């Protein structure tokens, strides 16, 4: 009975996954399931514009933190406690706002539009350690990184990240 249920469930998952999306270069079949590779997305601008600014910021927050963590691990031997504290100091809103200010002159017109979209988004809660202006700038930076990630522009994300990390972060 369990084998029958597993096969039936597998068939349902296969049917739903195939029905929902068409095979693309970033999809592959695995065990009868069509899997989408979320590490190499390449959304069109119209698809990205359908995502809310805060949704893009949510994604961009993870992208930025992963870059910071990778950068810190690559920069030398630190204890876990030191890595965590350094990560927190780089991903907090005041530090991200300072990076956003340094990044603005480097942005293209489309990138600036994504940044402003995030910066102007209405947020409901602002942390105590940041001003409204700092939090808005940080949200703009995260929105930009989210949009670049979802459009598959990883080289541009890395370029902007490296250029802003060259200078010391704000404490």
What do these predicted regions represent?
Residues 2:
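Non-catalytic nucleic-acid-binding interfaces of large nucleic-acid enzymes and RNP effectors
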Residues 5, 9, 13-171:
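Double-stranded RNA-binding/processing signature
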């Amino acid at each position: 009975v369990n084998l029958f249920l597993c096969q039936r469930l597998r068939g349902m998952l296969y049917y739903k996954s195939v029905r929902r999306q068409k095979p693309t270069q970033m999809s592959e079949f695995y065990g009868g399931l069509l899997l989408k590779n979320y590490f190499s997305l390449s959304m069109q601008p119209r698809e990205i514009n359908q995502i809310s600014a805060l949704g893009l910021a949510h994604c961009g927050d993870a992208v930025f933190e992963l870059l910071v963590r990778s950068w810190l691990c690559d920069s030398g031997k630190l204890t876990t406690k030191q890595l965590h504290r350094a990560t927190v100091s780089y991903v907090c809103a005041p530090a991200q706002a300072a990076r956003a200010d340094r990044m603005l002159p480097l942005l293209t017109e489309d990138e600036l539009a994504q940044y402003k979209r995030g910066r102007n988004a209405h947020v409901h809660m602002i942390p105590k350690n940041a001003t409204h202006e700092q939090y808005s700038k940080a949200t703009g930076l995260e929105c930009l990184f989210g949009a670049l990630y979802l459009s598959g522009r990883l080289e541009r994300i890395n370029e902007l990240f490296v250029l802003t990390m060259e200078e010391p972060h704000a404490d």
